[in-house]
């Protein structure tokens, strides 16, 4: 198996057929809904909150609300349905999460999307949760993860998952590979390719995205949607503390398995960093879309499908050629 990561790959351009990149369509379909771009902010507490979720839903972007304020999920689903926006929440696999599914079913609330969100998604506990959701809320689109092997993808799909989330510890604030010796950190793009070849349903690439060009690379190697953490951290709208150092503003960004999220130093596989303030989330989304439109134009097409067909080269660690962004 070829092993490589985002910084090792460059996509090879095809003849451009559009007059302007603005003609290129970045729309993606996931389940019953179309979204403006194949990107989704990570379902982490310092990345997504209710106001951001509402902004994304209102403006045609996909989102997944995090699961760390458990009691707010049913009111959140109600609110989003009242506003006729998509409802998309996360669950774990503990007993209280089964009670949540039962309560949603009892109240006749069917979220459009539920993401089963645990670090090691290739497990009996995730399979059982998939089956419970599909039994009690059969119309809900279920995303399950996280996984890093074709066997895991097939098993979760066979259990009823509508999409799988691929990535074990490649994120900027994840230290799974250091703490455990396991993961897809350092070869996330190759793992995505490996898993996508086995998949019959959509794959969400999760982790390791450091530049906007990495979104196009994820699409090329089989992702339908790309989950992004660090590039969405540090915005005006982001949750988390702000600090000022030498006149420069920074915002905190921590992993879901960090002691800052857990509230205790137990089974820690995440850390906290400070991200320089980036301004408005809206501006970042516009720039991402423009860059992805450029990617489509370089691929020689008019929509995302063109990116899936381009050739590529593997040139280890040479993408920046000594430059920094």
Swiss-Prot record:
SUPFAM superfamilies (UniProt xref): Inosine monophosphate dehydrogenase (IMPDH) (SSF51412)
Similarity annotation: Belongs to the IMPDH/GMPR family. GuaC type 2 subfamily.
GO biological process: purine nucleotide metabolic process
Catalysed reactions listed for this entry: IMP + NH4(+) + NADP(+) = GMP + NADPH + 2 H(+)
Gene3D superfamilies: Aldolase class I
GO CC terms in record: cytosol; GMP reductase complex
Entry keyword set: NADP, Oxidoreductase
Molecular-function GO term, any one: GMP reductase activity
Entry-linked PROSITE patterns: IMP_DH_GMP_RED
UniProt name for this protein: GMP reductase
KW rRNA processing (keyword) present: no
């Amino acid at each position: 198996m070829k092993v490589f990561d985002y910084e090792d790959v460059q996509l090879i351009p095809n003849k451009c057929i559009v007059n302007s990149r603005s003609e290129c369509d970045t729309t993606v379909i996931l389940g019953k809904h179309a979204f403006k771009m194949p990107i989704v902010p990570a379902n982490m507490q310092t990345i997504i909150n209710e106001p951001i979720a509402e902004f994304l839903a209102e403006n045609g972007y996909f989102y997944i609300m995090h699961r760390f304020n458990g009691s707010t999920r049913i009111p959140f689903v109600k609110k989003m349905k009242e506003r006729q926006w998509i409802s998309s929440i996360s669950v774990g696999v503990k007993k209280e999460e089964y009670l949540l599914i039962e309560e949603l079913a009892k109240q006749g609330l069917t979220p459009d999307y539920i993401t089963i969100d645990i670090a090691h998604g290739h497990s009996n506990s995730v399979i059982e949760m998939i089956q419970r959701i599909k039994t009690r809320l059969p119309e809900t689109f279920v995303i399950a993860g996280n996984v890093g092997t074709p066997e895991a993808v097939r098993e979760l799909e066979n259990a009823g998952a509508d999409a799988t989330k691929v990535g074990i510890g490649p994120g900027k604030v994840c230290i799974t590979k250091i703490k455990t010796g396991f993961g897809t950190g350092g070869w996330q793009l190759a793992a995505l390719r490996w898993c996508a070849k086995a998949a019959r349903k959509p794959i969400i690439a999760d982790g390791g995205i450091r530049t906007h060009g990495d979104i196009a690379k994820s699409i090329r190697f089989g992702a339908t949607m790309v989950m992004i953490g660090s590039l969405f951290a540090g915005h005006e709208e982001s949750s988390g503390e702000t600090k000022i150092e030498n006149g420069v503003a920074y915002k905190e960004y921590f992993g879901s398995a960090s002691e800052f999220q857990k509230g205790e130093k137990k089974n820690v596989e995440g850390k906290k960093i400070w991200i320089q303030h980036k301004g408005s989330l809206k501006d970042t989304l516009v720039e991402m879309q423009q860059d992805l439109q450029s990617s489509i134009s370089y691929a020689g097409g008019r929509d995302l499908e063109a990116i899936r067909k381009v050739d590529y080269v593997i040139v280890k660690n040479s993408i920046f050629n000594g430059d920094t962004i």
